[in-house]
A protein has these predicted regions:
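A generic structural signal for short
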Residues: 3, 30-31, 105, 160
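Flexible lysine-rich "adenylation lid" loop at the C-terminal edge of ANL adenylation domains
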Residues: 1-4, 63-68
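A short, structure-level motif marking secondary-structure boundaries and short turns
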Residues: 26-29, 156
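Phosphopantetheinylated carrier protein domains
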Residues: 19-27, 34-62
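Short acidic-aromatic active-site loops that bind/stabilize oxyanions
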Residues: 1-5, 31, 133-137
Length: 361
């Protein structure tokens, strides 16, 4: 089973880098490390999580799931004010410095943008907008006033991976409607399904059949028979709570963080599938991977099909598609994020140059 959230991805990748061998899967029994390697692993995990992971933590974890559970508490900590996470603060001596605003991916937090931040100019401020409930439009309606409070009339640099890209796009529309200066919008593999996702009762049944197979593989549990009639009476929130409660009742020990990740992942992906995309009169950059990962396609087969414009061409007046290769799940980490960072740095430098020229005039 591959990593399921940011903590498991960081832990999995760190194990592979330090030992030179893939752990295989998150449930695979980890080989015993010597003390030097365990210390090196602990140091690297501590740097990524920004919290104290010890060699003892590494040596006593039987698999990646167990080690990631220790990493998660630190990785998801940090400075948060309401729903805004400070990834790098704007320098006090330069309040005019234009920050990058990033938006959380489906089922995750904005800590996933650390590798991107490390690929941008060293003094680039970055603020992450964390999860609020509701449709895409309802979430953007909460984010836009906060963006204006932080950045006034602009310019605005907005970016996001996965759902984060859809949220960045919705906020760009909200800001433009209020006459604000949106300088740049970047979608990191926020690629729409290549075919329409039907919203019918029959589709609800098919979706939950697929989810049951996905959950059995991901959690290593047996899902009891799904009571479709009961599910059909519930909204998306009620449906996922119902199914996850059944998973919990199975008696298998699953970290609370993973259960919450599954709940928010499901709701966030449903928000994408049911969003009504509005036209945008401006420039948007889409960093496009080759494909979605197998789990995403297993859950919604229509994501196996990708349009050359990622499904955005009919809405965006000036769309730039930048191919980055790889799978969706890899797009936010090294080495692929280096391509995004290099292109984005160029775009940021051009914006700063234009701004300096205008101020000079």
């Amino acid at each position: 089973v591959p990593p399921r959230d940011a903590a498991e991805r960081v832990t999995f990748a760190t194990w592979a880098i330090v030992t030179g061998k893939s752990p295989g899967g998150i449930f695979n029994l980890l080989p015993k490390l010597d003390e030097d390697t365990a210390a090196k692993m602990a140091q690297r995990l501590s740097e990524r999580a920004e919290g104290p992971i010890t060699a003892e933590d590494v040596l006593t974890s039987e698999n990646i799931q167990a080690l990631a559970d220790k990493v998660r508490q630190y990785l998801e900590a940090g400075t948060i004010d309401g729903f805004v996470r400070t990834l790098r603060a704007r320098p006090e001596d330069d309040p005019t410095k234009v920050p990058v605003f990033v938006f959380h991916p489906a089922g995750g937090s904005t800590v996933v943008y650390e590798p991107l931040l490390n690929r941008l100019p060293a003094d680039t401020p970055m603020y992450g907008f964390e999860r609020v409930e509701g449709t895409i439009e309802e979430r953007a309606a909460q984010y836009v006033p906060k963006l204006i409070e932080m950045q006034g009339d602009g310019p605005y640099i907005l970016a996001g991976w996965s759902l984060g890209g859809v949220l960045a796009y919705a906020c760009a529309i909200g800001l433009k409607r209020l006459g604000k200066d949106v300088a740049w919008v970047g979608l990191i593999d926020a690629v729409r399904a290549g075919e329409e996702v039907p919203q019918t009762k029959e589709e609800i049944r098919k979706r939950w059949d697929r989810y049951a197979r996905f959950a059995e593989k991901t959690f290593q549990v047996t899902i009891p028979e799904i009571p479709y009639e009961q599910l059909e009476e519930l909204d998306d929130e009620g449906q996922i709570r119902f199914v996850l409660e059944a998973v919990k009742q199975s008696g298998v020990q699953i970290p609370a963080g993973i259960i919450e990740h599954q709940r928010t992942s499901y709701l966030d992906n449903r928000a994408i599938d049911t969003a009504e995309i509005q036209p945008y009169d401006g420039h948007v950059t889409l960093y496009m991977a080759d494909r979605y990962h197998d789990d995403a396609i297993m859950f919604e087969p229509r994501y196996a099909v990708r349009k050359p414009d990622g499904g955005w061409g009919e809405y965006v007046s000036d769309l730039e598609v930048v191919p980055i290769g790889g799978e969706h799940i890899q797009a936010i980490d090294e080495p692929i994020i280096a391509k995004v960072g290099a292109h984005m740095t160029q775009a940021l430098n051009e914006i700063m140059h234009r701004r300096t020229s205008e101020v000079g005039k």
